[in-house]
């Protein structure tokens, strides 16, 4: 078995990639034909529905309420996540292009998986979809995109499609357990999206550990313009994160509050990150790794508690703490994990998604357990935590306990599911790149030949362990030449 897994890698995907894409897309067409239908607000019978329910205006259609949030979330998925992964000096095509591939396949599979768990009409056997389903599908595929961040530059597009197939499936199951069986509240997905997606990617990366990855060390870094492109992704994510955390919250005060809390958490996180990044450098200079990534951790951590009455200063505290935790993670935890736990995390998703997501889940548990009628009002408590039906007698303390349990479920699903999927992806049939060919677009993309040679002085081995030592060596060699 060891010899089987240790066979020579071959990045040839001319047969496997078209085959997987064609077969799975045809399967989607068939499954959509069998199961998927328009819901009453997107069906042509909407006119009759308006008359029956005394609706006088099309403005009551959910499209006009949800679509602005859907637009923002959609931009985050395709532009924000995509460009955030373009920091590698020779892997920008793969960063944004494979992000596009994962998302395009994942949203189709997510509409089916989430539909079977949440929206299946048992009387007809059909799944009826509208604009809210599109938002949820984007949320679902976000978990797989986060996992991709841990594997960036080290896997083939076929492996990424397999990762997405299992990732969306696992997401739908853990989401059903957390939101329906445990009755947790997680509007912005700190638990179900970020904690799960982060640990899912880390679990896969741990199994796919490459002891000879140093052979691609020359490409495991950024250049000036690649970091600028990555910063574009950061800014899109940062600007639209309030929409992400509030997109599927209840109409009214909950959605309004979620946007405010996220807005403040993000702002606080930026200042904290800048302060720590500057403190770490002897000359007070800022590190783009921290600015691109750790500045977003506040939005991740505010996901669960976004619609709760955490208060504006509470949101600032969460962002402040996440800025510290995430920046320290990039400085010290990521090198530790690679050296001692053999965990290679290209984008540092452990610091941006996994830990802040887990922290956000526990923050939500504490805030839920501390909720009182004097702060929320009786009706406000019922509405915020959905204490209705069989949950009408649930206390806030019990709700806090279930919120904490939901966080543990998300982490467990991510780690265990990631390890299992990692073993599947370890089979040498997926066309993954050799150790000396990682982080290089030429393995899977036609790269223009007329690229200008980048002067060594503009290169710096960012997103790497011992990078400061490498910078010093590079600068020294340039000065001597």
Swiss-Prot record:
SUPFAM superfamilies: Ammonium transporter (SSF111352). Residues 37-67, 114-132, 181-187, 249-258, 312-314, 373-404 are extracellular. The chain crosses the membrane at residues 16-36, 68-88, 93-113, 133-153, 160-180, 188-208, 228-248, 259-279, 289-311, 315-337, 352-372, 405-425. Specifically expressed in the gill by pavement cells (at protein level). One of its GO terms (biological process) is ammonium homeostasis. Keywords: Ammonia transport, Cell membrane, Glycoprotein, Membrane, Transmembrane, Transmembrane helix, Transport. Coiled coil: none annotated. It holds the Pfam family Ammonium_transp. InterPro entries: Ammonium/urea_transptr, NH4_transpt_AmtB-like_dom, RhesusRHD. One of its GO terms (molecular function) is ammonium channel activity. It is a multi-pass membrane protein. It is found in: Apicolateral cell membrane. Residues 1-15, 89-92, 154-159, 209-227, 280-288, 338-351, 426-481 are cytoplasmic. GO terms for cellular component: apicolateral plasma membrane. Homotrimer. Functions as an ammonia transporter. May play a role in the elimination of ammonia in the gill. Belongs to the ammonium transporter (TC 2.A.49) family. Rh subfamily. This is Ammonium transporter Rh type C 2. It comes from Takifugu rubripes. The gene is rhcg2.
